[in-house]
Amino acid sequence: IKKIEIKRYINILKSGLYLLLADYSIILLFGIGRLFIEQSWGIEEFSKFSFSMSLVLLGVNFVNQIGLVLFPVLKKDYSSNFVNMYNKLNLNVNILLLLLPLGYFIIVWILSKWLPQYKISLFYLGILMPLAIFEAKMVLIINPFYKATRKERILLLINLTFCILRCISFFLLRIYSFNILYYLYDFLLLSFLKYILFF
């Protein structure tokens, strides 16, 4: 009995470790971009980009807290009503995310009055808005369902793969391009590919 209990605790610890690393790899995806931009363009351009990315991360982290609340509910009921719960949640989230562009225009209007010197940051924020939508769906729908179905290792593997791809793509961009917009488009492209892969 003790051996069985020890194995069970080890499996629980492994699952927790996979989830922890998967969550940190998401943060790393954003951190890699900040690091490369700071190294390539200096602190002034980095501050403009970082302001936009901080707003995106603020929204993603807020949505992530909602996903943490959803996980126990999904874990309890997924076996009996999994497909219906997924479809219903996906529909509701899609409706809510349609309001995100409206929120962007409100934020731009407020910040343009309050911080006019950060006008270029608001432009970057508009480019990164689809990234916020992709990541919000990831942390609100995909991550909780992968956790509920005990697919933490797949979640970690995909996140780490895209961390490596982002490092490679940013390294190539640093060599062959000095346009910061290409970095932003690279952010969007890889996030979109990850979103498609999970769905």
Model-predicted regions and their roles:
Residues 1-28, 69, 73-83:
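Interhelical loop/hinge segments that connect adjacent transmembrane helices in multipass membrane
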